[in-house]
Amino acid sequence: MSIKEWPEDERPREKLLRQGPGGLSDAELLAIFLRTGVSGLSAVDLSRHLLQQFGSLRALLGAEQRAFCAAHGLGPAKYAQLQAVLEMGKRHLAEQLQRGDPLTSPQLTRDYLQAQLRDRPREVFALLLLDNQHRVIQFVELFYGTLDSASVWPREIVQIALKHNAAAVILAHNHPSGVAEPSRADRQITDRITAALALIDIRVLDHLVIGDGITVSFAERGWL
């Protein structure tokens, strides 16, 4: 049965307009994005099939182009459309943390860093630079690959902070495994960076480790 033949209060688009997006299932949200199903499957049924095939909504949204386009009911046009939607979401968060805005919401910071780092296939170490009123100066990606004491250089972080005249920073990196629990190396690197920046009176406000929908805060753990 086509979705058009469903009772109006069960149609995903009408439900979203009436209840808001938070009241819809993953399959219903995906169905609105897909708009149409395929032969024998409504858009919702196709969405359920795709979610089962990929394992989760996150896995589907983060799939590489070849795997995404190979799935029944998808293709290059849908992949391009999805990438545009995801990028607009990132830019929406970025505009809320744009240069000159005071950093007043810890949750906004988490959401922004999740959007920037969560789905990266390798580790990325980044820096959020702030002025003395905790207004955002710039977000900078610094190091890539497995992060340890040999790959993260406090001296480079000091140079970047001085270049942008930062008064404080927030450190962030992702764990591609999805497990956000900080390692011993993460804590050691943070201590080294904090000590190096303290020599020039720049505070480390937090170090956020980004996992699969989970963010661990060093500040909340009492480690800073």
Swiss-Prot record:
GO terms for molecular function: metal ion binding; metallopeptidase activity. Residues 102-224 form the MPN domain. InterPro entries: MPN, RadC_JAB, RuvA_2-like, UPF0758, UPF0758_CS, UPF0758_N. One of its GO terms (biological process) is proteolysis. PROSITE patterns: MPN, UPF0758. PANTHER family: DNA REPAIR PROTEIN RADC, UPF0758 PROTEIN YEES-RELATED. This is UPF0758 protein AHA_0160. It comes from Aeromonas hydrophila subsp. hydrophila (strain ATCC 7966 / DSM 30187 / BCRC 13018 / CCUG 14551 / JCM 1027 / KCTC 2358 / NCIMB 9240 / NCTC 8049).
